[in-house]
């Protein structure tokens, strides 16, 4: 009888361990999908309008990236929380309404606390509503998965988007103007001024990388680098 009890206890411990490992792997996979494997910017190629238009500087790119990440996380949270109460027939209009409400809140916050950056980003803040990645994650993930997993998915996808935006913005700013994180104090306050660096000094900027053609060239470089790394891993 004692041996049977010990075997049952050992079996329960193995099952608990297997479930715990499975849960950890799910969290890791969701994060990896957002950051690298299914990155919204350099894999899915979604949200190209703000990606190309706003990434002229690292500060602008980071500001829009953080706003997008906040919107993604909040909308995934709300949609997952109420997924059982949203009628399938009208789910898309409801998703758009939730996204628009969240974007409006973020827009008002940026207007209040980062006004200079708000002016710099302009129309691209409200245009977050039309970003395909947000409604895509709502439909593909948040409406079908648990609350915590949906929050993590929104954060991971948003972080992947923000990283891609910031890297592209930094690349264009360094080559085009010789600086990085110029005007970062408009986003994080005067205490963040130490992040601004002048890589090289020039009398005239390299306009090609500041203008839209530079955005396409920079994005092409990022895609090439990612594909190269993926091929090496294989």
UniProtKB/Swiss-Prot annotation:
Transmembrane segments: 62-82, 92-112, 116-136, 151-171, 205-225
Cellular component per GO, a single term: plasma membrane
Top EC class for this record: translocase
Subcellular location, record wording: Cell inner membrane
Pfam families: Rnf-Nqr
Membrane topology: Multi-pass membrane protein
InterPro entries, per database record: NqrDE/RnfAE, RnfE
GO biological process terms held by the UniProt record: electron transport chain
Keywords noted in UniProt: Cell inner membrane, Cell membrane, Electron transport, Membrane, Translocase, Transmembrane, Transmembrane helix, Transport
Enzyme Commission code: 7.-.-.-
Coiled coil ranges: none
Quaternary organization: The complex is composed of six subunits: RnfA, RnfB, RnfC, RnfD, RnfE and RnfG.
Function: Part of a membrane-bound complex that couples electron transfer with translocation of ions across the membrane.
Membership in a protein family: Belongs to the NqrDE/RnfAE family.
Protein name per Swiss-Prot or TrEMBL: Ion-translocating oxidoreductase complex subunit E
Lineage: Bacteria, Pseudomonadati, Pseudomonadota, Gammaproteobacteria, Pasteurellales
Gene this chain is encoded by: rnfE
